[in-house]
């Protein structure tokens, strides 16, 4: 027999009630309201009634005078004309869960109800605080949230802030402008990017879903904690699964960044909070912009794309380098990528362009290394910067061909050890799911060239992962039998296949580690351990003697046995020197100290010490030649 109170009318009467009643009465009302759900519903139905109605426990609908006031020819303090109600926008349904900030009503001395315009901001909060004896604005706002009926209920926002598991899903920011469109981003054109660390916001009115496992810092300024004029809607469920580098690039950030979008009349504090939510979605932003200086990320290919001559120089330097890219990517295959990017730049942009950027950056880095010191330090810094620019698209590794995976690992090895480790993990996971088995349907649709490159790419990954894991003191993940294909044979264009040489070195190193440092090896007898030690040394020496003739003396420390005059082959020579002496250190150095007593005989301990000393002498001799003054003239004295 009694209609439910309108949510807007209840809000107006609540403000009036807060300013007209004493602190003791308000405290009692709050306790009485939160005591039970049933009592709160009973209070909310007659909270808007005047004092006379309350004294008689008469329920007042707030729109027309109650029966008691009509009977005694009185006027309700909460009365509003029907004309004023029809001119207001309708209250949203419960499914939409949209609440409108109402206008404030006050009663003048003559008993006539007047309408006070609602402020556009929440600067009325200090006045509300002054009317409360405790001065706790947060409690006032809780009362405001509780002062609703059961149909148009508003959640208590401030209670959720006290928990670490912050969930703002029941919160909706609403202002007085009911026609304001919610903030949304049209990301329909980004569907081809693969799995992103967020779901695109919806473009229609819907219930927000902000389930972010990060506590949000809240300011003590209550005026910055309430919504302003326009409605703000986010639908960004964050998936905690996946690698930590599930990233987006700078161009995506420019599209979804709140600073680049109109957020209505949100306060600066609220805008900072929204921006912090976006930045918490990924920690990639700082790493992608690291080392770029003033360069624009979305134009990191501009330095070479319009310069055909520079592209040819970088490409030639990249594929002339016997180690790295040329071991698993042919120049003709790369030329097809370049032509595809020029003819249809939007089709394979995420896969082809990062590949081209990486090859160009790697080639420029080689050119800069060859021209030193005549080129100066500026060229060297520019080469490092361009390598970092190519690395900034490394999140595309998960959605790129396998060739790009290994390519970006090669570049990252020159720059950042941490990034290199992460890319190796991505590549191993990807390669294990695509092992190019004979039973795989993809194998039947592969061209001969792509099948050849796929095999070499997987073995190149093996050669990198084994050495990298052992350097970090971890057992290798990949083994020589991890794929159905045998080791690559001699390359097509040269008698020396450097990929085969790298894989043989990885095999020798992995075999030595398993024979000497595995859990089973630690339980061996002294004779078995010494036999395995000599067998590991024999495998390493067999690898050294299989190198080209000019590299077979990398174990000697005498001057003249290692040629470093040629700038084009110096990096290759030093790489082979490093691989050999690093293996000597891994095999023998742990047995040179007193801690090996009882594990090997004294003869083998001294033999290990002798090999390590000779290895150190050879490395120091080469380092002295490199750092000598002769290198400043562009050549090294033999």
Curated annotation (Swiss-Prot):
Location in or out of the cell: Nucleus
InterPro entries with a match to the protein in the record: AtrR-like, Zn2-C6_fun-type_DNA-bd_sf, Zn2Cys6_DnaBD
Gene Ontology MF terms: DNA binding; DNA-binding transcription factor activity, RNA polymerase II-specific; zinc ion binding
GO biological process, one term: positive regulation of metabolic process
Disruption phenotype: Impairs the expression of the terrein gene cluster and subsequent production of terrein.
Induction: Expression is induced by methionine. Nitrogen starvation induces expression of terR and promotes terrein production during fruit infection, via regulation by areA and atfA. Iron limitation acts as a third independent signal for terrein cluster induction via the iron response regulator hapX.
Function: Transcription factor that regulates specifically the terrein biosynthesis gene cluster. Recognizes CGG direct repeat consensus sequences in the terrein cluster forming the high affinity consensus motif TCGGHHWYHCGGH.
Name under which the protein is recorded: Terrein cluster-specific transcription factor terR
Source lineage: Eukaryota, Fungi, Dikarya, Ascomycota, Pezizomycotina
């Amino acid at each position: 027999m009694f209609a439910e109170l309108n949510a807007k009318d209840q809000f107006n009467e609540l403000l009036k009630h807060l300013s007209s009643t004493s602190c003791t009465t308000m405290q009692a009302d709050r306790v009485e309201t939160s005591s039970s759900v049933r009592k709160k519903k009973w209070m909310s139905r007659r909270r808007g009634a005047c004092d006379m109605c309350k004294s008689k426990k008469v329920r007042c609908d707030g729109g027309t005078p109650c029966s008691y006031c009509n009977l005694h020819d009185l006027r309700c303090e909460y009365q509003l004309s029907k004309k004023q109600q029809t001119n207001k926008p309708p209250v949203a349904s419960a499914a939409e869960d949209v609440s409108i900030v109402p206008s404030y009503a006050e009663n003048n001395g003559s008993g006539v109800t007047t309408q006070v315009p609602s402020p556009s901001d929440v600067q009325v909060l200090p006045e509300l605080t002054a009317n409360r004896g405790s001065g706790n604005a947060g409690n006032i706002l809780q009362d405001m949230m509780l002062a609703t009926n059961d149909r148009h209920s508003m959640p208590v926002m401030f209670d959720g802030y006290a928990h670490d598991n912050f969930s703002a899903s029941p919160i909706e920011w609403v202002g007085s402008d009911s026609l304001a469109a919610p903030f949304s981003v049209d990301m329909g054109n980004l569907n081809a990017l693969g799995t992103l660390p967020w779901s695109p916001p919806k473009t229609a009115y819907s219930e927000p879903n902000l389930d972010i496992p990060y506590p949000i810092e809240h300011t003590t300024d209550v005026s910055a904690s309430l919504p302003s004029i326009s409605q703000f809607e986010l639908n960004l469920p964050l998936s905690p699964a996946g690698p930590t580098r599930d990233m987006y690039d700078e161009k995506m950030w420019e599209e979804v960044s709140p600073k680049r979008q109109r957020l209505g009349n949100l306060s600066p504090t609220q805008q900072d909070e929204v921006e912090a939510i976006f930045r918490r979605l990924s920690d990639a932003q700082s790493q992608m912009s690291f080392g770029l200086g003033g360069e624009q990320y979305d134009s990191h290919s501009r330095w070479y794309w319009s310069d055909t001559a520079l592209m040819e120089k970088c490409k030639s330097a990249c594929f002339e380098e016997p180690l790295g890219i040329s071991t698993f990517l042919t120049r003709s295959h790369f030329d097809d990528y370049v032509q595809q990017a020029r003819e249809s730049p939007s089709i394979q942009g995420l896969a082809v362009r990062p590949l081209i950027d990486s090859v160009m950056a790697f080639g420029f880095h080689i050119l800069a290394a060859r021209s030193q010191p005549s080129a100066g330090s500026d060229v060297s810094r520019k080469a490092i910067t361009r390598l970092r620019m190519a690395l900034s698209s490394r999140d595309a590794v998960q959605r790129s061909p396998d060739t790009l995976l290994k390519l970006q690992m090669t570049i990252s090895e020159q720059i950042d050890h941490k990034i290199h480790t992460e890319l190796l993990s991505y590549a191993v996971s990807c390669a294990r799911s695509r092992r190019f088995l004979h039973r795989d349907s993809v194998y039947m649709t592969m061209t001969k060239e792509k099948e050849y490159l796929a095999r070499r790419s997987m073995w190149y990954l093996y050669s990198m992962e084994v050495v990298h894991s052992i350097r970090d003191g971890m057992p290798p993940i990949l083994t020589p039998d991890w794929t159905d294909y045998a080791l690559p044979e001699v390359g097509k264009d040269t008698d020396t296949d450097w990929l085969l040489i790298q894989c043989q070195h990885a095999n020798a190193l992995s075999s030595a580690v398993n024979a000497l440092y595995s859990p089973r090896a630690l339980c061996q007898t002294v004779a078995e351990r010494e036999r395995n030690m000599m067998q590991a040394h024999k495998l390493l020496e067999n690898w050294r003697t299989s190198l080209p003739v000019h590299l077979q003396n990398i174990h000697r420390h005498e001057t003249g046995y290692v040629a470093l005059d040629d700038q084009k082959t110096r990096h290759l020579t030093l790489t082979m020197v490093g691989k050999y002496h690093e293996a000597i250190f891994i095999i023998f150095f742990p047995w040179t100290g007193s801690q090996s007593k009882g594990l090997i005989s004294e003869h083998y301990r001294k033999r290990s010490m002798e090999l390590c000393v000779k290895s150190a002498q050879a490395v120091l001799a080469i380092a002295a030649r490199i750092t000598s003054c002769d290198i400043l003239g562009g050549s090294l004295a033999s």
